[in-house]
Amino acid sequence: MKTRVRKTLFLLVASGLVLAACGGTSSGVTLAPPVQNNPPAVIDVDADGNTSFNLDRLRDELAAIPLGTITAAEEDGLLYMREEEKLAHDVYVELNRLWQHNTFANISLSELTHTEAVLLLLDRYSITDPVGLNAAGVFTDPTLQGLYDLLVALGSASLIDALMVGAEVEEIDLIDIQTWLTDVEGNDDIVMVYENLMKGSRNHLRAFVRALERQNVVYQPQHLSQDDYDEIINS
């Protein structure tokens, strides 16, 4: 089995695209351990690890949580994550169009529920949706627009490159959610959605790594620390 390492992190950093809204690259961000208690069952996970929000159950759980006061940092996080989850969906849809691979087809459906879960929070706090009527591949945030364009270009080179892009998207997602999660000040509704988004990204990262293994490729983490990556893959 061969090891493929593409220095995409360098390309993303050089383009100013990795975690720009959070003030830097992924270095220094350590993922919190997965929540070990029994949170509300608002996600469904199938045998392949595809992780989708059950939006009806999520609505019920959100309705039971008192509405708090949202800070500017929390609002920024929701706006960014709404579009970043859309980015994952749109990238996977485009890469599935190019390569007709079930991993993209299945995870793109899950990602659609992820961005809708964040939309429920935007609506709950009366925050204007940055997605609006934007088409696939179109983003209000210029950082995410540039990242989408770059990731699709990288994933267009080959199926292996496309699967590596998928794994990188999930790495970036995990780091961004963890960063925004540290800004949440007592709003349990936001914490619940973010923690479940992280569960989804962990599962989807594992799915892309398995798909690469079937192509005889050993994926090396591009953004997560080796310890965080190993904990996810071995759990």
Indicate residue ranges for each PLM-predicted region:
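Bacterial N-terminal signal peptides that target proteins for export
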Residues: 2-9
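C-terminal motif of bacterial Sec signal peptides marking the signal peptidase cleavage site
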Residues: 17-21
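Bacterial lipoprotein signal-peptidase II cleavage site
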Residues: 23-31
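All-alpha RGS (Regulator of G-protein Signaling) helical domain and cognate RGS-like helical scaffolds
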Residues: 35-235
